[in-house]
Swiss-Prot record:
Allosterically activated by GTP. Inhibited by UTP. This is Uridylate kinase. It comes from the Bacteria. Its EC number is 2.7.4.22. UMP binds at G54, D74, T135, G136, S137, P138, Y139, F140, S141, T142. Catalyzes the reversible phosphorylation of UMP to UDP. ATP binds at K12, L13, S14, G15, G55, R59, N163, Y169, D172. Keywords: Allosteric enzyme, ATP-binding, Cytoplasm, Kinase, Nucleotide-binding, Pyrimidine biosynthesis, Transferase. InterPro entries: AceGlu_kinase-like_sf, Asp/Glu/Uridylate_kinase, Uridylate_kinase, Uridylate_kinase_bac. CDD domains: AAK_UMPK-PyrH-Ec (cd04254). The lineage of its organism: Bacteria, Bacillati, Bacillota, Bacilli, Lactobacillales.
Length: 238
């Protein structure tokens, strides 16, 4: 078995990562490709937890702009993340990876309720654990969910898998041709410079709990495995 740098990993997977080129909804072929990448990580012996976003289905801020109460819109977003959790669970189990979906909002007919010690036990048994439903409270993003769950399960790292962006830049590299990429940053750098890595609540929580992040392009095959093995790709935030 290959040597790995990070034993217990929390992967933040955006909803858009499951929608393919459409950018909205669900794409089975994309989910299959993502699942195969995750199986590689699992087969290395890493304990893998996943936090799903919901942006391919719904964003709370979208509803707020349309005149919805923010809390109500956020609850819709939480339900979107549960759909994504079930979708990636199916893709993983189709290729033989045992998984559990755990939700912050109880819906026992669909998934297990989130219980921290039970989640840790699943990881110890080699199951991939998918955290869905956000934190269960409105006004908190899935970035914050990632930082919270990583702290709760004592994850060694948060992997921020990005679509088509290979790290953290001082400007949007898709819009600014000479944007500068950072190889290493501190959490305080991210906060003070206003870099778009994760929201400020998530950044502060990661800093306070000494959880490193690696921001990388998930569209390049094998990158998740490379990060877990300790290869220097993307941007590391510590």
């Amino acid at each position: 078995m290959a040597e790995i740098k990070y034993k217990r990993v929390l992967l933040k997977l955006s909803g858009e990562a499951l929608s393919g080129e459409k950018g909205f909804g669900f794409d089975p072929e994309t989910a299959k490709a993502v699942a195969e990448e995750l199986k590689e990580v699992h087969d290395l012996g890493a304990e893998l937890a996943i936090v799903c976003g919901g942006g391919n289905v719904w964003r709370g801020v979208t509803g707020e702009k349309a005149g919805m109460e923010r809390a109500q819109a956020d609850y819709m977003g939480m339900l979107a993340t549960i759909q994504n959790g079930l979708f990636i669970q199916s893709a993983l189990e189709n290729i033989g990876v045992d998984t559990r979906v755990m939700t912050a909002i109880e819906m026992k007919a669909v998934a297990e309720p989130y219980i921290r010690r039970r989640a840790e036990r699943h990881l110890e048994k080699g199951r991939v654990v998918i955290f869905a439903g956000g934190t269960g409270s409105p006004y908190f993003s899935t970035d914050t969910t990632s930082a919270l769950r990583a702290a709760e399960i004592n994850a060694d790292v948060i992997l921020m898998a990005k679509n088509g962006v290979d790290g953290v830049y001082n400007a949007d590299p898709k819009l600014v041709a000479d944007a500068i990429k950072f190889e290493h940053l501190t959490h305080m750098d991210v906060i003070t410079k206003g870099l778009q890595v994760m929201d400020s609540t998530a950044s502060t929580m990661s800093m306070d709990n000494h959880i490193p992040l690696v921001v990388f392009n998930m569209n390049e095959a094998g990158n998740i495995t490379r990060v877990v093995r300790g290869e220097e790709i993307g941007t590391t935030v510590e």
